[in-house]
A protein has these predicted regions:
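Class I Rossmann-like S-adenosyl-L-methionine
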Residues: 1-208
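Conserved hydrophobic/aromatic pocket- or pore-lining residues that grip, position, or stack substrates
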Residues: 133, 157, 219, 227, ...
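Glycine-centered loop/turn positions within well-structured domains
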Residues: 155, 225, 237
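Active-site-adjacent "gating/activation" loops or surface patches in catalytic cores
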Residues: 202, 217, 235
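Glycine-rich helix-loop-beta junction characteristic of Rossmann-like nucleotide cofactor-binding loops
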Residues: 209-210, 229-235
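Class I SAM-dependent methyltransferase Rossmann-like catalytic core
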Residues: 211-217
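Conserved class I S-adenosyl-L-methionine
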Residues: 236-243
């Protein structure tokens, strides 16, 4: 919510909003691993850096490692320009650290996933969480769980059944919505066994989309859709939602 507020106030277009959103969430998600890579090349450890320097280095490193669409020189130059506005004296330091990361990226990214500590660093989890998972599931399965959790989730839309016109089938309504989305250049696909679900790629801002604003679709994971189908609630059913957002 806070991020959306700032993005809307900044007046950015959808492409820039997407860039900022990935950067913010990516840094939060990968913070420990980013700090690990920065510490490999920096004489000053991350925990001893000024807040502005630490943040800009995380931003630059994330772009170098995780954003293939951003050229290395662009990530470095923009990071240097940003730190000049915040702390001009640190510009040469930020430049040197990011260039060292760029030059030796493969070596800097490498980490052997053979210990709890290294799993915690690479997947950016607190050590106690990884220890608990290993105790419960074993080392190999824990790595598989952490790897799965690190994947970017797909976006699924649930079509609202209450929008059906008299005599209209759900298949027809979903099909029309899919055609509408494809006409806007979005990649969409239906989901076998869940007729109200649509997988969509390239959707930047759902909250402003007419289909969302008019109540035809909402964003929902497949697991949540399956729960509702298994429950099969009736018109007079009383349902207690314990996981409401």
């Amino acid at each position: 919510m806070a991020l959306n507020k700032y993005l809307n106030e900044a007046g950015l277009d959808d492409q820039d909003k997407g860039f900022v959103t990935e950067l913010v969430y990516g840094i939060i998600e990968k913070k420990r691993y980013l700090d690990y890579m920065i510490n490999k090349v920096s004489k000053i450890k991350v925990r001893k850096m000024q807040h502005s320097v630490r943040l800009v280095l995380r931003m630059g490193t994330y772009q170098l490692v995780h954003m293939d669409g951003v050229a290395d020189y662009a990530a470095i130059n923009e990071s240097v320009n940003l730190i000049k506005k915040l702390d001009k004296r640190s510009a040469s330091f930020v430049n040197a650290v990011l260039r060292n990361i760029s030059r030796s990226l493969d070596d800097i990214k490498s980490i052997r996933l053979n210990t709890v500590d290294n799993l915690a660093i690479y997947y950016s989890y607190e050590k106690w969480i990884v220890e608990g998972l290993v105790k419960e599931y074993g080392f190999e399965r824990t790595e598989a769980i952490l790897s799965a959790l690190s994947q970017k989730p797909s976006i699924y839309l649930r079509v609202n059944r209450t929008k059906l016109r008299p005599g209209q089938s759900m298949d027809d309504l979903v099909g029309k919505i899919v055609e509408d989305l494809r006409g806007q250049g979005l990649e969409t696909s239906r989901i076998d066994g869940i007729e109200e679900a649509i997988k969509v790629k390239g959707l930047k801002s759902i909250d402003k989309h007419p289909l969302f604003r008019e109540g035809y679709v909402s964003v929902q994971d497949l697991s949540s859709m399956l729960v509702a189908r298994i429950m099969d609630p009736k018109r007079e059913s009383r349902v207690l939602d314990l996981c409401a957002a």
